[in-house]
């Protein structure tokens, strides 16, 4: 028996020798460094810790403004390819590919007690959005839906540490950031990745919404969808889908946050990003970074959508604009839940966020 254990113990140790450990993370394994023989291409160097704020101030439509300590939340791992707009050359510059570990907005805001202004006429929180700022005055906006309804629930983080995703053949070492930063993993161009965020404000959509959920309101939908660049400025009124855009079809397991499984459905429509491109182009980077849209139905039901989550996606989970008869609706392929798939659309409006 003694001889058996002398033989088997060295074999048990073999798997551990294929990678180098730097403070093992038993949950994600994200602190492992890649070594020859490992199949994980995201861990080819040790992480670098980023300096930055240790706390966040949260206010707005909340029961009590509060300061939260970031270190109380778990670190979530995300990978992202970052690119930014260069004003000088009117071009896109690739910054690099990185693995970040940071504090997810989903975790930070999960325990927050919201007191939204619209609670009397719209119970779901889908009309909420947040503004994130730093001490330099930079701002980025996110809808409540892309934080809490998204199928990628930990995809927006305040990064605390970083490693490069190093190309195996070229060995290119991208420049590392030096300070903590906001990371949105589904953004094609990284305009919302502002450095060292310190402040979050919670808001709800404002507008002349008339809430009437009676079935006949949707049945008598006139089929007129206003595209508005402000509360007073209507850029277009759609009565049909564009003729020159392709139709996309998604077969889905439809699931509501409140009512659960709704069956297997198939949704066909046009990419909303392309339909609204004449008024909200993806290369209007200031609006992509700070713009929030109200998408509302004739019955007053509405949801907030950041401009970025519609026109600046990199995950190909497009929001579809559909038309059934004369009535417009959207399907949100990016969401785990059906709640923001609004029917009987009457407006897509750019709202005025805080300066």
Short names for language-model regions:
Residues 20-355:
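N-terminal intrinsically disordered, low-complexity segments enriched in P/E/S/T
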Residues 8-15:
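Bacterial N-terminal signal peptides
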Residues 1-4:
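Positively charged n-region of N-terminal signal peptides that target proteins for export
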């Amino acid at each position: 028996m003694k001889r058996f254990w002398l033989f088997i113990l060295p074999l048990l140790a073999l798997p551990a020798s294929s990678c180098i450990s730097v403070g093992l993370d038993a949950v994600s394994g994200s602190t492992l460094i890649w070594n020859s023989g490992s199949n994980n291409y995201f861990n080819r160097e040790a992480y670098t810790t980023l300096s930055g704020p240790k706390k966040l101030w949260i206010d707005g439509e909340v029961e009590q403004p509060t300061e939260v300590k970031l270190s109380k939340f778990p670190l979530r791992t995300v990978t992202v390819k970052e690119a930014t707009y260069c004003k000088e050359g009117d071009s896109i510059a690739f910054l690099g590919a990185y693995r970040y570990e940071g504090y997810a907005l989903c975790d930070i805001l999960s325990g927050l007690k919201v007191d939204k202004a619209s609670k009397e006429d719209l119970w779901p929180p889908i009309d909420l959005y947040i503004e994130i700022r730093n001490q330099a005055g930079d701002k980025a906006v996110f809808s409540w839906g892309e934080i809490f309804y998204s199928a990628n629930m930990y995809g927006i983080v305040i990064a605390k540490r970083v490693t490069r995703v190093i190309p195996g053949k070229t060995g290119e070492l991208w420049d590392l950031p030096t300070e903590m930063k906001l990371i949105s993993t589904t953004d094609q161009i990284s305009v919302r990745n502002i450095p060292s965020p310190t402040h979050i404000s919670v808001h709800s959509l404002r507008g002349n919404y008339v809430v009437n959920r009676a079935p006949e309101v949707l049945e008598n939908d006139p089929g007129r969808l206003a595209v508005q660049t402000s509360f007073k400025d209507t850029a277009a009124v759609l009565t049909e889908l564009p003729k020159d855009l392709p139709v996309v079809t998604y077969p889905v397991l439809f699931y509501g946050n409140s009512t659960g499984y709704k069956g297997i459905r198939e949704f066909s429509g046009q990419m909303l990003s392309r339909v609204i491109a004449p008024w909200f182009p993806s290369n209007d980077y200031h609006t992509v970074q700070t713009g929030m849209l109200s998408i509302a139905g004739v019955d007053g039901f509405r949801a907030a959508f950041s401009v970025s989550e519609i026109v600046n996606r990199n995950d190909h989970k497009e929001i579809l604009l559909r038309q059934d008869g004369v009535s417009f609706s959207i399907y949100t392929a990016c969401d785990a839940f059906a709640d923001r798939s609004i029917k009987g659309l009457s407006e897509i409006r750019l709202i005025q966020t805080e300066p």
